[in-house]
């Protein structure tokens, strides 16, 4: 249309198109440098790529040619620190100024009591689930999946693994979304009901499941708690801790697992249940029909009805164990202002960040 406005014409209506453009993956690249974007990105944002020291950090500098309002920061450095103990030490030593998503919730109280830091607690789009391989011979029977759901005490997991940070969920949808329906009562903690369902399925005290866990603390800690809860109803688990590369290869790609725990942080990603080849292998034509209707629907009220029906369907089918919505727990130097409290998409946006005097 002009130098700063484009017109996009779609071949079919797509009610989610505008939302998709807000994803972190939806970026604008210079066609002349797009092929080298993986190692030397050249985009349109308020920062320019400066340096990538693999395994250590990525450095950005201010883009003085930015089309929008000028930013306050001259540069920013993103360091890679995955170990919770190292994260705590880095903040205390002043080696880093902020952890937008801090990996050690057990030490947040210490930062809250320290005037040199701000603890920033908000919401994410991360549905944390006990992902279930629906094609596993041990888990094909809905009564077994339902028994697992009733064996799980969500609040105990939130308290024990996340130190109280998180909101229990009963389906794959963010509680802060206006179309969310609370279905937690449908799979409430009821060990006796769980035992009865296992008996009906003919697997009482004879079921052993693999539980493969990726690195995040919510998975490792949550996995131990869930294993204990399942043991109380007669289900044994074989826990295997994996690094991300192993998890992606064995679980996500290879589908070689019974249970795993992961937080799905993409916004409005309930559509993954429409893909029977996705790693939990849920195959429902009824659900696919709902997603087809959703993609073509542009009326918000009609989309809301479809989304609520979709939430109910996957809860009724006990596709996965729905645990909690991941909280965004951040820690920052008290003089640093403007960091996101909530995480509506997968991004660390520093556009509005500055240092106070």
Show where each model-derived region lies.
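A local structural motif
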Residues: 8, 68-79, 95, 204-211, ...
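Alpha-helical secondary-structure segments
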Residues: 3-9, 45-46, 73-75, 92-93, ...
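Ligand-site clamp/hinge motif
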Residues: 35, 64-109, 236-238
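Detector for C-terminal structural segments
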Residues: 53, 151-179, 218-227, 245-357
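Periplasmic-binding protein-like
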Residues: 120-132, 176, 284-290
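Short helices/loops that flank or line small-molecule/ion binding pockets
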Residues: 85-96, 113-114, 142-143, 224-233, ...
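Surface-exposed binding/hinge segments that line
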Residues: 1-29
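Gly/Pro-rich hinge or "lid" segments in bacterial periplasmic/extracellular proteins
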Residues: 19-71, 75, 83-85, 192, ...
């Amino acid at each position: 249309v002009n130098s700063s406005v484009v017109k996009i014409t779609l071949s079919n209506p797509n009610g989610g198109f505008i939302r998709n453009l807000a994803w972190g993956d939806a970026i604008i690249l210079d066609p002349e440098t797009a092929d080298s974007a993986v190692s030397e990105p050249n985009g349109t944002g308020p920062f320019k790529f400066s340096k990538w020291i693999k395994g250590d950090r990525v450095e950005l500098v201010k883009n003085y040619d930015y089309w929008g309002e000028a930013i306050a920061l001259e540069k920013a450095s993103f360091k890679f620190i995955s170990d919770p103990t190292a994260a705590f030490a880095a903040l205390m030593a002043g080696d880093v100024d902020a952890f937008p998503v801090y990996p050690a919730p057990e030490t947040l109280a210490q930062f809250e009591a320290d005037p040199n830091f701000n603890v920033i607690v908000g919401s994410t789009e991360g549905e944390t689930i006990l992902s279930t391989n629906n094609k596993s011979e041990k888990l094909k029977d809905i009564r077994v999946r339902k028994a697992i759901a009733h064996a799980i005490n969500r609040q105990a997991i939130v308290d024990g693994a996340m130190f109280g940070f998180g909101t229990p969920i009963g389906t794959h949808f963010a509680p802060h979304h206006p179309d969310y329906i609370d279905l937690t009562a449908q799979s409430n903690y009821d060990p006796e009901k769980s035992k009865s369902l296992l008996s009906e399925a003919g697997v009482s005290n004879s079921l052993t499941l693999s539980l493969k866990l990726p690195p995040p603390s919510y998975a490792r800690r949550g996995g131990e708690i869930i294993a204990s809860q399942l043991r109380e109803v007669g289900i044994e688990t074989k826990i295997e801790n994996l690094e991300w590369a192993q998890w992606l290869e064995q679980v996500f790609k290879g589908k070689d697992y019974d249970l795993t725990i992961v937080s799905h942080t993409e916004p409005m990603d309930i559509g993954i249940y429409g893909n029977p080849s996705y790693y939990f292998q849920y195959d429902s034509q009824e659900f696919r029909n709902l997603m087809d209707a959703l993609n073509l629907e542009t009326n918000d009220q009609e989309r809301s009805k479809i989304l609520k029906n979709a939430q109910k369907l996957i809860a009724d089918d006990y596709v996965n164990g729905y645990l909690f919505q991941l909280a965004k727990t951040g820690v920052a130097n008290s003089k640093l202002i403007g960091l996101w409290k909530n995480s509506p998409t997968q991004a660390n946006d520093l556009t509005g960040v500055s240092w106070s005097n």
